Amino acid sequence: MIIVDTNVVSELLRPEPEPCVEQWLSRQDGQTVYLTAISEAELRHGLAIMPAGKRRTALMDAVDHILREDMAGRILPFDSAAAQSYAIIAAGRRAVGRPIMQADCQIAAIAHAHGAPVATRNTPDFEGCGIDLINPWNAE
């Protein structure tokens, strides 16, 4: 299981995604790639604040396809186990003077509860959370 951060999905939605991200994803077993409900919320929020128009409509269709088809059955909720991990991660980061954004902490907590790594461009945001990190922008 690998949990992809919101920025990985956002990259794939760009008109010209970074080839390294596409290549990294193509090397993964699709059934082992997961998303969190937090990332779903971030994607949907980003679309909701976009101006109405063709671009927004096209991106909404693409995101709906990803969520309903590509990631069907592989969107992880923020549950009680994640809530326990959240408390540990947030307190630990605060104790060392590195507070973490709520959404990042929720994603990290879901990954921690599942023993899964997070694939993200923003690895510093997730350091010190007790999870493994993968950066598809510079993965071998």
What are these language model-derived features?
Residues 28, 71, 129-130:
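Short, structured coil segments at secondary-structure junctions
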Residues 1-39, 47-66, 140:
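Short, well-structured N-terminal submotif of metal-dependent ribonuclease cores
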